A protein has these predicted regions:
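RecA-like P-loop NTPase motor core of helicase/translocase proteins
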Residues: 2-259
Length: 259
């Protein structure tokens, strides 16, 4: 009797989260190296806010927890982590100074907000100061991913230096994305100015919105965070005197050749 044909092996669909090479690289610096483990350690109200006493005075309480129980000190030096944390505190206090008065209480970072900003510090430090090593580490992570895949279509091409100047964030609804973006702007400027001079700014900082209503809303939000911001003005955008202003434009006006 003829043998029945072998059943074809069904291709296993790779989980989207497993394809986030940059995310995997960032998590490799920590212990636990997954969000679930970090959440279990940090997601407690007593760890929110700033330390006021002891060796870690001025640091976040998250920093103290990470140093004591979580951080793999062989991967990132503890003094580097301390600097990252102080930068986060500095930027967060700047954008919440006016908001604290409006709210009548001090706004503290949640653990997921802190991790997003901590990862940004690590990324920007590597990008501006250790780019060659960063590129190599990312490609090692990518090669490991490719080796684990059995289907050619799931193979990724190696990172190139020009790929590193773009980064995207994925934050849940209600996670405070607007405030995180404001801190991200300050984080980028901090590293940019450290490399190029304290009084230098990028040619333009542009915030793109989906409509005029959100442009107005973001203008107010940026003002409340202490930024110089304005709705997009083509003449201003060409003038180096306004480089410290954030230009806000809705995407419907990108093709406007007159404005």
């Amino acid at each position: 009797m003829a043998k029945a044909p072998k059943a074809k092996t069904k291709a296993v669909k790779v989980n989207f989260h497993e394809q986030l090479i940059l995310n995997k690289w960032l998590w490799s610096k920590f212990n636990p190296n997954r969000l679930e483990g970090m959440k279990q350690q940090l997601d407690h109200p007593q760890f929110e806010g700033i330390e006021h006493e002891g060796d870690n005075a001025g640091q976040t309480k998250f920093f103290s927890v990470i140093c004591n129980t979580l951080f793999n000190k062989q991967v990132v030096d503890i003094d580097v982590l301390r600097r990252y944390d102080l930068n986060i505190v500095k930027h967060w206090q700047k954008i919440t100074e006016k908001r604290n008065e409006i709210e009548g209480h001090v706004l503290n970072l949640k653990y997921f907000q802190y991790l997003s900003l901590l990862f940004t510090e690590l990324y920007l430090d590597q990008y501006f100061n250790h780019q060659a090593g960063m590129l190599n580490e990312l490609n090692v992570e990518l090669e490991q991913y490719n080796d684990d895949q059995k289907i050619d279509a799931d193979q990724f091409q190696q990172y190139l230096p020009e790929d590193l100047n773009k980064i995207g964030y994925w934050n849940a609804t209600g996670s405070g994305k607007t405030l995180l973006m404001h801190v991200n702007i300050l984080q980028y400027l901090d590293y940019f100015q450290h490399q190029n001079g304290d009084s230098t700014y990028p040619d333009q900082i542009i915030l793109l919105t989906p409509n005029e209503g959100l442009s107005e809303q973001h203008l107010q939000e940026l003002t409340d965070s202490g930024f110089q911001a304005t709705l997009f003005d083509k003449q201003k955008s060409r003038n180096s005197l306004y480089r410290d202003e954030i230009q806000i434009i809705d995407m419907n006006k990108l093709s406007d050749t007159d404005g």
